[in-house]
């Protein structure tokens, strides 16, 4: 049996990015043969990535990038908030955001196939899954290409906003982006609110108004009033400006001789059902997984 030295473990870790203990185990299994140990690790990390792929990713980060004429937001998901703070995970998210802005992929599949450091983006992702031990997924991205100005705002790493705007004052773009993160409008103007949201609000308003017992014509006016109130509340231009609620966003923009063309808002895990296991079930699952290895 060949002696496994610390320098051998360090060399294998540098080649594979695998955890120290995994490197030592692989070298021991390979009887000190570096090439064989590297192959064993790559197979093992690949298996690790495959096992992780079925697990829910409801945590993560939003990353942004703005270049000369394009900007992007990317949501990268993982399983725990601990990994969401990992330096390698965050560096990958920022790199992916830059790729979206500069390479203009059509969708996540096209993004995953882009070259990155001699591999594809997906191969780098899988290597990171193997290294960290959690499932990692690129959930979505948005890209704005324009000759206008772009502003981004990240609230921590869980909320991200990108805004396309015109105007001389850069602070206006930053303020609008921050406002979007705080107030979470669903559209630029009331005309842009999705029809399904309006219909849902109308049904709720009709049910409430019907309970009032008032005449039909009064009920109809109550419903219309509720819907109009809803449209103002969820459209950016009609919302009171978060830094000065005596002005709407539209009024603030007009006073600044500025205009917003569009915006996008990402909130990490929005719409993803996060699995809640009890402690006993979690322990049982870990024991079962250990028996299969």
From Swiss-Prot:
Annotated GO MF terms: translation elongation factor activity
Keywords of this entry: Cytoplasm, Elongation factor, Protein biosynthesis
Compartment list: Cytoplasm
Region (Involved in Mg(2+) ion dislocation from EF-Tu): 80-83
Domain of life assignment: Bacteria
Broad class of where this protein is predominantly found: cytoplasm
GO cellular component: cytoplasm
Keyword Cytoplasm: yes
Job of this protein: Associates with the EF-Tu.GDP complex and induces the exchange of GDP to GTP. It remains bound to the aminoacyl-tRNA.EF-Tu.GTP complex up to the GTP hydrolysis stage on the ribosome.
Family: Belongs to the EF-Ts family.
Entry-linked HAMAP family: EF_Ts
Annotated protein name in UniProt: Elongation factor Ts
Record organism: Burkholderia thailandensis (strain ATCC 700388 / DSM 13276 / CCUG 48851 / CIP 106301 / E264)
Name of the coding gene: tsf
């Amino acid at each position: 049996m060949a002696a496994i030295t610390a320098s051998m473990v360090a060399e294998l870790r540098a080649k594979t990015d695998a955890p120290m203990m995994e490197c030592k185990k692989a070298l021991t299994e390979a009887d000190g043969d570096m090439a064989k140990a590297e192959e064993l690790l790559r197979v093992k990390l690949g298996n690790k990535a495959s096992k992780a792929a079925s697990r829910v990713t409801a945590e993560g980060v939003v990353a942004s990038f703005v270049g000369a004429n394009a900007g992007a937001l990317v949501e990268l998901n993982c399983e725990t908030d601990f990994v969401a703070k990992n330096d390698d995970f965050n560096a990958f998210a920022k790199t992916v955001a830059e790729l979206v802005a500069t390479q203009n992929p059509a969708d996540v599949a096209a993004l995953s196939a882009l070259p990155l450091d001699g591999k594809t983006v997906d191969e780098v992702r899988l290597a990171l899954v193997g290294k960290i031990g959690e499932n990692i997924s690129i959930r979505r991205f948005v890209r704005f290409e324009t000759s206008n100005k772009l502003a981004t705002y990240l609230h921590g790493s869980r909320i991200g906003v990108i805004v396309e705007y015109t105007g001389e004052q850069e602070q206006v773009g930053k303020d609008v982006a921050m406002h979007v993160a705080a107030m979470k409008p669903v559209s630029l103007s009331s005309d842009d609110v999705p029809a399904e949201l309006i219909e849902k609000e109308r049904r709720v308003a009709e049910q409430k108004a019907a309970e009032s017992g008032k005449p039909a014509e009064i009920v109809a006016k109550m419903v219309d009033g509720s819907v109009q109130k809803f449209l103002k509340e969820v459209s950016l231009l009609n919302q009171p400006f978060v830094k000065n609620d005596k002005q709407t966003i539209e009024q603030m923009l007009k006073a600044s001789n500025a205009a917003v063309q569009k915006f996008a808002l990402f909130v990490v895990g929005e719409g993803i059902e996060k699995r809640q296991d009890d402690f006993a079930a979690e322990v049982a699952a870990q024991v079962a997984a250990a028996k299969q290895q």
